[in-house]
C-alpha cells in the first residue's frame, strides 16, 4: 500500500500547523516549508507537540527551481498551499 505523503507550503501558520496535526493523526508522512526553516522557530508546531514529527525545508515559492527541487526530493502524494501573509499591514509592506 502506498504511503500518503503531504507537502504543506506555509506550515508555520495557524492553518498549516493544524492541517499538519490532522494529517499526522491520520497516518500521513508530513513535510513542511517555510521561507527560512533555519530561522523560523515554528512555535505553533512546538505547542501542538508535532514539530519533531515533521520534516521542515526552506523553500521560496517565487523561485521555480526551489519548488521543483522540493517536489523532486519529497515526491508528495498531496500538496497544500497555505502560504501567504496573513497580516493586512505587513501585506502592504511586504507584498
How does the language model describe each region?
Residues 1-95:
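N-terminal Rossmann-like NAD(P)+-binding domain of SDR-like oxidoreductases, especially those catalyzing
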Amino acid at each position: 500500500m502506498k504511503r500518503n505523503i503531504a507537502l504543506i507550503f506555509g506550515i508555520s501558520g495557524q492553518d498549516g500547523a493544524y492541517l499538519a496535526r490532522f494529517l499526522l493523526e491520520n497516518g500521513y508522512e508530513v513535510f513542511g516549508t517555510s521561507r527560512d526553516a533555519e530561522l523560523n522557530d515554528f512555535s505553533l508546531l512546538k505547542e501542538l507537540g508535532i514539530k519533531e514529527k515533521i520534516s521542515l525545508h526552506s523553500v521560496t515559492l517565487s523561485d521555480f527551481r526551489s519548488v521543483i527541487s522540493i517536489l523532486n526530493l519529497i515526491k508528495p502524494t498531496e500538496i497544500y498551499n497555505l502560504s501567504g501573509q496573513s497580516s493586512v499591514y505587513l501585506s502592504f509592506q511586504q507584498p
